[in-house]
């Protein structure tokens, strides 16, 4: 197996005195989709947010262990968190377009990072919208408000906005749970296409979705990572009975 993109060693995470993650060890492979599954409150979203330090924004949290991105500990004191979040971006559960035009949503990140050339920005906007399978639907109305898009289009816009800053890793926290079935299918097709260029980690409550879109699956329960393997093995021949019980609907 190739060198992992992200390596997690003995990760523990605390909200105050509450230990939300317990000795998590995991290797996330590059150019693959890794799904995180488990019942509500199991720690999967907390774990996802440790991967680009979004939990830093919460008072009273602390962490032990290490998370290595291409061999570098992202919690080392010298790490630039803004630069980290450019490399490891997040797509949230509900679409959150900025109250500005479609064009300006996509150009927002590149402008922050110093790109001012109109020609360069035009190219980034077009490439990003094409990568997010949205260009054909919005090419004629780039100056219109992004808030006028449908929910599914808004979520693909948010993915395009993330791709515009050229991340290496894309984190997705239930990216289609607020969408209708047709929009969900488009997001799943997009995830499949994006893994050629990006490493993707997705939290989902939808077991069928995890089985459809992911190459690897990690099952979390009560803050522990119970089992991690290729998705086909997790869903057909899990080693741990707790995994089998969850997947077959005996609890969750």
Swiss-Prot record:
Subcellular location: Cell membrane
Domain ABC transporter: start-end pairs: 6-247
Major location (coarse): membrane
Topology relative to the membrane: Peripheral membrane protein
Enzyme Commission no: 7.3.2.1
GO BP: any one term: phosphate ion transmembrane transport
Binding site for ATP: 38-45
Molecular function terms from GO: ATP binding; ATP hydrolysis activity; ATPase-coupled phosphate ion transmembrane transporter activity
Complexes and interactors: The complex is composed of two ATP-binding proteins (PstB), two transmembrane proteins (PstC and PstA) and a solute-binding protein (PstS).
Protein name: Phosphate import ATP-binding protein PstB
UniProt lineage: Bacteria, Bacillati, Bacillota, Clostridia, Moorellales
């Amino acid at each position: 197996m190739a060198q992992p993109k992200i390596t997690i060693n003995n990760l523990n995470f605390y909200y105050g005195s509450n230990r939300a993650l317990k000795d998590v060890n995991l290797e996330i492979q590059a150019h693959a989709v890794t799904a995180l599954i488990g019942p509500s409150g199991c720690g999967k979203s907390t774990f996802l947010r440790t991967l680009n330090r979004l939990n830093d924004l919460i008072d009273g949290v602390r962490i032990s262990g290490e998370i290595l991105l291409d061999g570098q500990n992202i919690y080392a004191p010298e790490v630039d968190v803004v630069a980290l979040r450019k490399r490891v971006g997040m797509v949230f559960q509900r679409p959150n377009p900025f109250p500005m035009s479609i064009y300006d949503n996509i150009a927002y990140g590149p402008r922050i990072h110093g790109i001012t050339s109109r020609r360069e920005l035009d190219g980034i906007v077009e490439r990003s919208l094409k990568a997010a399978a949205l260009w054909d639907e919005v090419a004629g109305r780039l100056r219109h408000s992004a808030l006028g898009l449908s929910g599914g289009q808004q979520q693909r816009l948010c993915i395009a906005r993330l791709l515009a800053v050229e991340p290496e890793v894309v984190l997705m926290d239930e990216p289609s749970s607020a969408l209708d079935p047709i929009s969900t299918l488009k997001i799943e097709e997009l995830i499949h296409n994006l893994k050629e260029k990006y490493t993707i980690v997705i939290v989902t409550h939808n077991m069928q979705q995890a089985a459809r879109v992911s190459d690897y699956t990690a099952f979390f329960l009560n803050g522990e990572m119970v089992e991690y393997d290729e998705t086909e093995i997790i869903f057909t021949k899990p080693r741990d009975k707790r995994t089998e019980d969850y997947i077959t609907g005996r609890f969750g």
